[in-house]
């Protein structure tokens, strides 16, 4: 978009004597002192601060953050604590990617007041779109601190004008120039334009000595149908790179040296990596030149290294020998810090969501360690050191070290096992396709945990070249940045609500959850796919939501009645699906909720909150709800956990849950201001998922658990009744499902178990206390009988095979025999076939083993017969499969057993013998 220059004209620039200029190198406009000639940003200039820092102070990353806080606190900004790096309050992204993300969507949309205005925050952020560049450009991080000072002007809940462009630029100038002592002639404010999330506005990029230190965004437009409209509220959205401020004030060769300090030397020493004066010179030069270009591909990296080698008069191979191990050290430290935050904030590595992204970072760190021939377990030591370094500023992370280390140990073990298993998968795919595409590499990584570099090495051993994109991990991360959209299947109801402009339904059940009978007025009736849906002005029927199934009941009026079969809420409008007569619009209806069903659902829902907290206390506070469903018979709770839940842990969870029931704790349900609720209870409020709105309904089990929840709940835990865990399963890597029942449903499950036990005892004619011993004895006897049967089957198969040479068909000089078998072990068959063809040089013996609609084939050829491998290739075509082997023995399989007959086998032998 072409921006009006007046958007950037400020009285402050005139006050300090800055002028608007056009950079002769890039053609972009910037504001700077009269003597400035270029915009001061790479690639128009090189980094000139490396080895020559322009600031009057020298700050590490923690000191830079403190100075940032103190400066803005003195300028009347309220300091906020950091938000988690996992964006629990949002359903569109997994990770916190910017400081403004902490206030989206509720504050920026105007729905919720800002927690402070103006405010300042030093927010740890994670972006993985440049993960492949971490370590080698000198400036890229997976986790970085974004210092943000934000002002929400004319906000619906705070109509003040806080400050806008003039004050924003003044504050940035004073912090950078006056506070940090960077000469004014070195700073430039480069004009730019920002767009994102449907909003847009002009912005300044703040640049010193080639390095962009901050971005000052003025969110003042919304994008509507390709047009820009003024927003009623205008938001100051700034992002200061705290790591970059540390780098520019220290002048270190790379940002990693500025951020990690002594950890770089300690880690390098442990890994046998030498960082001497030559190495630091090379690394500094690499960072300078990397700033002049986008290093996105392997060819870019080669260009970078060649340019630096020429400048330093070095052989490029020598440069790589010195620099690459240090780049690996930088990457390992960066990834360790990122993991300390991810795991410390409760992420459980898995194959989905934020857990997938954590696993991606872990496995890239392990690949870097592999590249240095280091023990993978060394990652644990690096993370331990990083946690100690973080302890002063983020003590909460160090407190979770036990979980962090345990999760990493699990992941290291999984990765090692995945590599062993994965090699077979790579070779299998190469046999099938003869190549590995990018999509193959992604699937091998996603489904089997095989890094693309390993897949390439295996393929090269098989003589197949594979191209691995240099930004592989970045591209994979982008695929998993946001949650997958779930199809709700309620589009037609949503269309009706919008087109009919239906008013929101009064949710009366929140006023009295015990009330089951009520009167209401019919707002409208609608037919959707043959079903009748009724909208009332008010309802006590709970609509499906939060994993809780909908209420059912009846609806009666003067001339008819109907059963309520389903209830759904769309855009605040509650639709009731009915079976029976259809009431007219405007009619008064008498409704009754099925009380028994409601009570069962209510008990199971409150029990879910109890079980979740019990799981957190037994397994650790990294446990997070990944899903839940509450029906009348049982409930299920999916929780994140890096290990399988043991029998002992499951029993302790059940014991704790029932202890809470017996304590009869009050269950408080109230609507609260979102900001107040978050301040009081933290983001664990959102265990059950994101809840929209300025006000959220908070369900608190006193002294036990607090969640934002819209479901129906008991008034005290005693109302739940007994809780019985009935099962557990691993539904995906990193997610455990706990199945349980509460109240009458729990008793029913206990009775079912007792009935099963009694019936079993009657069949076996034993008392319950003797059942385990009796079953064990029967099982041992069964195993012994099974062994005898298997031995007899093997003897029968061998006898059938050994009789084959005498029963075969003569084809010229050869004896051709097809033996058909069912459900036998291939290994024993192959051994017998191999023995027989050694004894009979003119024998062709083929065993077809049929099982579950497919078949496996063993081919044996005597010394004078056609080669077994060639026979197998032809047979593979008949059975719609494949296989291979050598001249004497071959094996294969296919999905069409009927394709191989003795006549077809004879034809194949004749063709090969004749050829």
From Swiss-Prot:
It is found in: Cytoplasm. Keywords: Aminoacyl-tRNA synthetase, ATP-binding, Cytoplasm, Ligase, Metal-binding, Nucleotide-binding, Protein biosynthesis, RNA-binding, tRNA-binding, Zinc. Its main location: cytoplasm. Zn(2+) binds at residues 605, 609, 709, 713. Residues 882-901 are annotated as: Disordered. One of its GO terms (cellular component) is cytoplasm. One of its GO terms (molecular function) is tRNA binding. Its EC number is 6.1.1.7. Catalyzes the attachment of alanine to tRNA(Ala) in a two-step reaction: alanine is first activated by ATP to form Ala-AMP and then transferred to the acceptor end of tRNA(Ala). Also edits incorrectly charged Ser-tRNA(Ala) and Gly-tRNA(Ala) via its editing domain. Belongs to the class-II aminoacyl-tRNA synthetase family. This is Alanine--tRNA ligase. It comes from Methanopyrus kandleri (strain AV19 / DSM 6324 / JCM 9639 / NBRC 100938). The lineage of its organism: Archaea, Methanobacteriati, Methanobacteriota, Methanomada group, Methanopyri. The gene is alaS.
């Amino acid at each position: 978009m072409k921006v009006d220059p007046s958007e950037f004209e400020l009285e402050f620039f005139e006050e300090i004597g800055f002028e608007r200029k056009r950079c002769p190198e890039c053609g972009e406009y910037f504001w700077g002192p009269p003597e400035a000639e270029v915009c001061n940003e790479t690639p128009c200039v090189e980094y000139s601060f490396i080895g020559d820092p322009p600031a009057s102070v020298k700050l590490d990353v923690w000191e830079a953050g403190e100075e940032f806080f103190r400066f803005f606190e003195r300028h009347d900004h309220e300091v906020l604590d950091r938000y988690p790096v996992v964006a629990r309050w949002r359903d569109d992204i997994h990770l916190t990617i910017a400081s403004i993300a902490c206030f989206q969507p509720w504050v920026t949309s105007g729905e919720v007041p800002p927690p402070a205005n103006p405010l300042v925050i030093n927010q740890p952020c994670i972006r993985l779109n440049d993960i492949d560049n971490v370590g080698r450009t000198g400036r890229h991080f997976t986790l970085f601190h974004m210092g943000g000072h934000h002002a929400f002007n004319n906000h619906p809940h705070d109509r003040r004008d806080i400050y806008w462009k003039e004050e924003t630029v003044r504050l940035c100038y004073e912090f950078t120039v006056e506070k940090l002592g960077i000469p004014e002639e070195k700073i430039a404010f480069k004009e730019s334009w920002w767009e994102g999330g449907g909003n847009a506005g002009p912005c300044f990029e703040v640049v010193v000595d080639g390095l962009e230190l901050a971005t000052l965004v003025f969110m003042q437009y919304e994008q509507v149908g390709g047009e820009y409209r003024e927003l009623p509220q205008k938001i100051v959205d700034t992002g200061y790179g705290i790591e970059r401020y540390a780098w520019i004030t220290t002048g270190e060769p790379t940002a990693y040296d500025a951020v990690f300090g002594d950890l770089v030397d300690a880690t390098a020493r442990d890994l046998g990596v030498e960082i001497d004066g030559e190495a630091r010179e090379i690394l500094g030069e690499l960072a300078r030149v990397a700033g002049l270009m986008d290093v996105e591909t392997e060819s870019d990296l080669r260009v970078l290294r060649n340019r630096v080698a020429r400048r330093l008069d070095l052989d490029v191979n020598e440069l790589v020998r010195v620099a690459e191990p240090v780049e690996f050290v930088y990457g390992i430290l960066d990834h360790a810090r990122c993991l300390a935050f991810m795991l410390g904030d409760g992420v459980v590595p898995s194959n989905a969501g934020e857990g997938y992204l954590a696993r991606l970072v872990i496995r890239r760190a392990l690949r870097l360690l592999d590249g240095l021939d280091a023990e993978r377990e060394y990652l644990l030591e690096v993370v331990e050191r990083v946690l100690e370094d973080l302890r002063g500023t983020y003590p909460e992370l160090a407190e979770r070290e036990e979980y962090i280390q345990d999760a990493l140990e699990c992941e290291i073990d999984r990765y090692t096992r995945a590599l062993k298993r994965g090699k077979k998968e790579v070779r299998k795919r190469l046999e099938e396709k003869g190549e590995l595409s990018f999509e193959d590499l992604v699937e091998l990584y996603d489904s089997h945990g095989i890094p693309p570099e390993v897949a390439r090495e295996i393929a090269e051993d098989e003589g197949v070249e594979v191209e691995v994109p240099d930004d592989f991990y970045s591209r994979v991360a982008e695929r998993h940045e946001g949650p997958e959209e779930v199809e709700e299947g309620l589009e037609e109801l949503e269309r009706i609500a919008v087109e009919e402009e239906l008013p929101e339904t009064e949710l009366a059940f929140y006023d009295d959850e015990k009330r089951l009978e009520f009167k209401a007025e019919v707002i409208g009736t609608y037919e959707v796919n043959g079903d009748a849906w009724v909208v009332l002005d008010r309802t006590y029927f709970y609509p499906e939501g939060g994993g809780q199934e909908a209420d059912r009941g009846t609806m009666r009026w003067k001339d008819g009645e109907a059963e309520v079969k389903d209830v759904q809420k769309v855009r605040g409008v509650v639709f009731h699906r009915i079976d029976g007569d259809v009431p007219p619009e405007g009619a008064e209806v008498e409704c009754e909720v099925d009380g028994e069903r409601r009570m069962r659902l209510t008990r199971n829902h409150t029990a879910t909150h109890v079980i979740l907290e019990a799981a957190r206390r037994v397994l650790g506070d990294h446990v997070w709800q990944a899903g839940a469903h509450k029906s009348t018979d049982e409930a299920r709770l999916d929780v994140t956990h890096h290990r399988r839940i043991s029998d002992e842990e499951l029993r302790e969870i059940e014991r704790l849950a029932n202890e809470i029931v017996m304590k009869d704790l009050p269950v408080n349900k109230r609507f609260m201001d979102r900001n107040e609720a978050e301040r009081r209870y933290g983001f664990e409020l959102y265990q059950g998922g994101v809840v929209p709105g300025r006000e959220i309904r908070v369900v608190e089990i006193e002294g036990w658990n607090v969640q934002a929840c819209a479901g129906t709940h008991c008034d005290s835990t005693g109302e739940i009744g007994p809780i019985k865990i009935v099962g557990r399963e691993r539904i995906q890597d990193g997610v455990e499902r706990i199945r349980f029942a509460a109240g009458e449903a729990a008793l029913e499950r206990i009775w079912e178990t007792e009935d099963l036990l009694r019936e079993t005892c009657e069949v076996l004619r034993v008392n319950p206390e003797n059942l385990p011993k009796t079953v064990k004895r029967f099982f041992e006897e069964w195993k012994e009988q099974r062994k005898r049967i298997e031995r007899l089957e093997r003897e029968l198969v061998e006898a059938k095979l050994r009789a084959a040479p005498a029963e075969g068909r003569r084809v010229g000089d050869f004896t051709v025999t097809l033996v058909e078998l069912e459900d036998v072990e291939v290994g024993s068959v192959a051994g017998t076939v191999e023995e027989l063809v050694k004894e009979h040089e003119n024998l062709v013996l083929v065993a077809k083993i049929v099982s579950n609609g497919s078949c496996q084939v063993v081919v044996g050829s005597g010394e004078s017969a056609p080669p077994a491998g060639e026979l197998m290739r032809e047979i593979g075509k008949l059975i719609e499969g494949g296989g291979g082997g050598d001249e004497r023995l071959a094996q294969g399989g296919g999905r069409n057993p009927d394709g191989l007959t003795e006549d077809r086998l004879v034809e194949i032998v004749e063709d090969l013998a004749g050829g």
